[in-house]
């Protein structure tokens, strides 16, 4: 059995992320989306909210599950008996950073990283950009799953009060 991890903060999950998850699920027997906890970053959504949004958005992928994790990604991968990391790439800048991480993960743990070129429709999409545009009243409904978009709007309304 082959298995892979799709790591990230997913604050919130975007359609670009879902594209990568679906493509990974088509290539691997088991895929775990790892919602990584960074104690130095305060997210808009809690880790539990992010996990719930991803689960709702990936319910049609039976070989995919969602977990949280912290610490070294390769430890997360090894503890679950998996053998690969899948990362989406939007730009050459993404590649430069992710290649260094992939080489380090291979060096310290022998874990391979597979890069998936983001679909052109999502090449500009990021969680940060979606949040920023939505904060100023811009329409980001085409960038997020519908339920995630509604949650984002709810968070922003709550902050305005």
UniProtKB/Swiss-Prot annotation:
Tree of life domain: Bacteria
Catalytic reaction(s) noted: (R)-4'-phosphopantetheine + ATP + H(+) = 3'-dephospho-CoA + diphosphate
Record: residues binding substrate: 9, 41, 73, 87
Binding locations of ATP: 9-10, 17, 88-90, 98, 122-128
CDD domains reported in the protein's UniProt record: PPAT
Gene Ontology terms: cellular component: cytoplasm
Cofactor: Mg(2+)
UniProt pathway: Cofactor biosynthesis; coenzyme A biosynthesis; CoA from (R)-pantothenate: step 4/5
GO molecular function annotation: ATP binding; pantetheine-phosphate adenylyltransferase activity
Gene Ontology biological-process entries: coenzyme A biosynthetic process
Leading EC class: transferase
Protein's cellular compartments: Cytoplasm
The entry's keywords: ATP-binding, Coenzyme A biosynthesis, Cytoplasm, Magnesium, Nucleotide-binding, Nucleotidyltransferase, Transferase
Site annotation Transition state stabilizer: residues: 17
Main localization category: cytoplasm
Record-listed E.C. numbers: 2.7.7.3
Subunit structure as annotated in this protein's UniProt entry: Homohexamer.
Role summary: Reversibly transfers an adenylyl group from ATP to 4'-phosphopantetheine, yielding dephospho-CoA (dPCoA) and pyrophosphate.
Stated family: Belongs to the bacterial CoaD family.
Protein name as annotated: Phosphopantetheine adenylyltransferase
Natural source organism: Mycobacteroides abscessus (strain ATCC 19977 / DSM 44196 / CCUG 20993 / CIP 104536 / JCM 13569 / NCTC 13031 / TMC 1543 / L948)
Lineage summary: Bacteria, Bacillati, Actinomycetota, Actinomycetes, Mycobacteriales
Name of the gene this protein is made from: coaD
């Amino acid at each position: 059995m082959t298995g892979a991890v799709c790591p990230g903060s997913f604050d919130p999950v975007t359609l670009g992320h879902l594209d990568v998850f679906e493509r990974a699920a088509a290539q691997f027997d088991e895929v775990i989306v790892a919602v990584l906890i960074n104690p130095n970053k305060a997210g808009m959504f809690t880790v539990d909210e992010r996990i719930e949004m991803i689960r709702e958005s990936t319910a049609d992928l039976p070989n995919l599950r969602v977990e949280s994790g912290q610490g070294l990604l390769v430890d997360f991968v090894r503890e679950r008996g998996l053998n690969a990391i899948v990362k989406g790439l939007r730009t050459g800048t993404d590649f430069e950073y992710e290649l260094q991480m992939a080489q380090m993960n291979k060096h310290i743990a022998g874990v391979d990283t597979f890069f998936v070129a983001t679909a052109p429709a999502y090449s500009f999409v990021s969680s940060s950009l979606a949040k920023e545009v939505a904060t100023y009243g811009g329409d980001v409904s085409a960038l997020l799953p519908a339920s995630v978009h509604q949650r984002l709007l709810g968070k922003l309304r709550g902050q305005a009060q």
